Swiss-Prot record:
UniProt name for this protein: Polyribonucleotide nucleotidyltransferase
Cofactor(s), by name: Mg(2+)
The keyword Metal-binding is annotated on this UniProt entry: yes
KH domain sequence ranges: 552-622
Lineage: Bacteria, Pseudomonadati, Pseudomonadota, Gammaproteobacteria, Pasteurellales
Organism, scientific name: Haemophilus influenzae (strain ATCC 51907 / DSM 11121 / KW20 / Rd)
Gene from which this protein is expressed: pnp
EC number: 2.7.7.8
């Protein structure tokens, strides 16, 4: 075995590509490394097409092995299970830029498998996997119009940083991944701390320029190690069949695409499609239904795109920059902590915000380390939202991806834990869908959070944009419909506040989209976002001053860290009894910060008072009320503040001589005692004699407790 190796510098890192030694039965296999983070990527492509195949069956699997980080998986079976949310998102990140680079009409099955086999905690495996997939596809000989490069762009101290480390990323105001060929950007996925449109576009251009190093390196690698390119020729169009479909359907489809209501339009289009299939198959029984449908779909695209380029009204009658009618309701669910319904045309999201305590945080165990997530965002897309029946179950890749995009849009305005000590979960239920449900989720989430009283820094809105380009002419569409989404050449989603962008996702299907075109599109998206924010601000101008009556209120207090063990008690007995008896939950940080969550404020104040008693210092000369806990021949033990026990010697029980302790005291009896002495070992000596005017200490919980709501 003589492996072929290509090594090159990429920014501050060294990238190594190796092939020829492992997985030689795969169509292509590449071991891609970047500073000890290594991803093994294989490509298997079938030479034959399944009979009746009418779509491109590309599958991308991304899997992380725990041995890559020197760990053994948890759980009973001690092996990796189903893909995590993070793995699913990275699989989508690999898929999106490579899919448009396969030629139209190529229907051979291809599977890309990326396996993380070694990980440097400072280098995220996602970029390495994208570079490895690009290299493997380029070597494989399949008709892939790559290679692509991939870059991560950070923004630190007002400077763009190429492929920042995990430590650097914590200081960055931007996390942007861009992928593309030597000529064009194909995919952008980003999260930003409210940057301007100009800064976002500059980051995209910067990343695309820098990744040319990768594109050139893979081309050189392929010259040395690549397999012969497949002798694949695109199938010739069946002009006779195309003309037949046009003759039957063109005029009728033109009329159907003037119906503004989605369901009525779809019914009409389905009827036309069924009629076309019936007429053509009646004339020619051997005519393929799949090919007829493909031609019919292409005709739909041609009609809609032609009208847009010609400047005619869109499918629903709007101009290119008009946003659909908006309708907003907040506080729609009486017992939830915050809720809103956001409707834009025929797209509708029911967003619900729930407040929880720190123990509700999600613990995420990644290869690069364990972390806690205090802001959860879940997106559900049930089949009824598009008038269909279907399976209801665990979230699919699309739902996970849309939920993450919506979360990115809102994350920048969320308060820190110090400002608002709650774990927050937002769920977006898509109840209607006709384009851009993920951006409706951003708007709905912003409204629900404000309804819940979460002090977000600003309202956030999202908008989905499209672009249609024919030669030198192009048209940017604001607030695209579902039909416009898949017929366009670029679709991108922008979320942000009035001040700037918080998330940008872009998928480009053709070459020739220049930075100038992107700038025009981003500016048009900004105008649409401002319009939506204006309507949202009318519905709820600021976060509610108070949280819901049904949400837990979190009260904080400070204790001496040395006293934490006293509050917890032996085996957790003290803290357990406090929570069980009062119905509260208590979290204690190492610095002595105590957080008490309770729906009932009286219960919280009760707990705080009891904690103050537990941690209170016993002072010599002060009289306390205590309870007799046990009797001995030589005296009685009495528990005073914080269940601290002291001894009342038999000689200190009464003024007269005491023969038998039980003649004077019983277990459980409440008595007043004075602290005589606390010795070096912390033992407390008490007396019941000479109790001058009572000086019982009173602990004022109100003075030392700060309520945070």
């Amino acid at each position: 075995m003589n492996p072929i190796v290509k090594q090159f510098k990429y920014g501050q890192h060294t990238v190594t590509l190796e092939t020829g030694a492992i997985a030689r039965q795969a169509t292509a296999a590449v071991m891609a490394s970047m500073d000890d983070t290594t991803v093994f990527v294989t490509v298997v492509a079938k030479k034959d097409v399944k009979e009746g195949q009418d779509f491109f069956p590309l599958t991308v699997n991304y899997q992380e092995r725990t041995y890559a980080a020197g760990k053994i998986p948890g759980g009973f079976f001690k092996r990796e299970g189903r893909p995590s949310e993070g793995e699913t998102l990275i699989a989508r990140l690999i898929d999106r830029p490579i899919r448009p680079l396969f030629p139209e009409g190529f229907f051979n099955e291809i599977q890309v498998v990326a396996t993380v086999v070694s990980v440097n905690p400072q280098i995220s495996p996602d970029l390495v996997a994208m570079i490895g997939a690009s290299a493997a596809l380029t070597l494989s000989g399949v008709p892939f119009n790559g290679p692509i490069g991939a870059a991560r762009v950070g923004f630190i101290d007002n400077q763009f940083v190429l492929n920042p480390t995990m430590a650097e990323q914590k200081q960055s105001r931007l996390d942007l991944v861009v992928a593309g060929t030597d000529k064009a950007v194909l995919m952008v996925e980003s999260e930003a701390d409210i940057l301007t449109e100009e800064q976002m576009l500059a980051a995209v251009v910067f990343g695309h320029q820098q990744q040319q190093v990768v594109v050139e390196a893979i081309k050189e690698f392929a010259k040395e190690a690549g397999k012969p390119r497949w002798d694949w020729v695109a199938p010739q169009p069946n002009t006779d069949l195309i003309n037949k479909v046009k003759a039957i359907a063109e005029a009728r489809l033109g009329d159907a695409y003037r119906i503004t209501e989605k369901q009525l339009r779809y019914e009409q289009i389905d009827a036309i499609k069924a009629d076309v299939i019936a007429q053509i198959t009646a004339e020619d029984e051997e005519x393929s239904e799949g090919k007829i449908v493909d031609i019919f779909t292409a005709l739909e695209s041609q009609i809609v795109r032609g009208r847009i380029i010609a400047g005619e009204p869109r499918i629903d009658g709007r101009t290119v920059d008009t946003v659909r009618a908006l309708d907003i309701c907040t506080g729609v669910l009486p017992r939830t902590h915050g809720s809103a319904i956001f409707t834009r045309g025929e797209t509708q999201a029911l967003a619900v915000a729930t407040l929880g305590t720190e123990r509700d945080a999600q613990i995420i165990d990644e290869l690069t380390g364990e972390r806690q997530d205090h802001f959860l965002f879940h997106y559900n897309f049930p089949p009824y939202s598009v008038g269909e029946t279907g399976m209801i179950g665990s979230p699919k890749r699309r739902e996970i991806g849309h939920g993450r995009l919506a979360k990115r849009g809102v994350a920048a305005v969320m308060p820190s834990l110090a400002e608002f000590p709650y774990v927050v979960r937002v769920v977006s239920e898509i109840t209607e869908s006709n384009g851009s449900s993920s951006m409706a989720s951003v708007c709905g989430a912003s409204l629900a959070l404000m309804d819940a009283g979460v002090p977000i820094k600003a309202a956030v809105a999202g908008i989905a944009m499209g672009l249609v380009k024919e030669e030198e002419k192009f048209v940017v569409l604001s607030d695209i419909l579902g039909d416009e989404d898949h017929l366009g050449d670029m679709d991108f989603k922008v979320a942000g506040t009035r001040e700037g962008v918080t998330a940008l996702q872009m998928d480009i299907k053709i070459e020739g989209i220049t930075p100038e075109i992107m700038q025009i599109a981003l500016n048009q998206a900004k105008s649409a976002r401002m319009h939506i924010l204006g309507v949202m601000e009318q519905a709820i101008p600021a976060p509610r001053a108070d949280i819901s009556d049904y949400a837990p209120r979190i009260y904080t207090m400070k204790i001496d860290p040395k006293k934490i063990k006293d509050v917890i008690g032996k085996g957790g007995a003290t803290i357990r009894s406090l929570t069980e008896e009062t119905g509260t939950s208590i979290d204690i940080d190492d610095d002595g910060t105590v957080k008490i969550a309770a729906v009932d404020s009286n219960a919280a104040k009760n707990v705080m008072g009891r904690i103050e008693e537990i941690v209170a210092e016993v002072e010599a000369g002060v009289i306390y009320k205590g309870k007799v806990t046990r009797l001995a021949d030589f005296g009685a033990f009495v528990a005073i503040v914080g269940n601290k026990e002291g001894l009342v010697h038999i000689s200190q029980i009464a003024e007269e001589r005491v023969e038998k302790v039980s003649d004077y005291l019983q277990v459980g009896q409440e008595v007043n005692v004075k602290v005589v002495e606390i010795d070096r070992q912390g033992r407390i000596r008490l007396t019941m004699k000479d109790l001058a005017p009572k000086q019982e200490t009173e602990i004022n919980q109100e003075d030392s407790v700060e309520e945070q709501e």
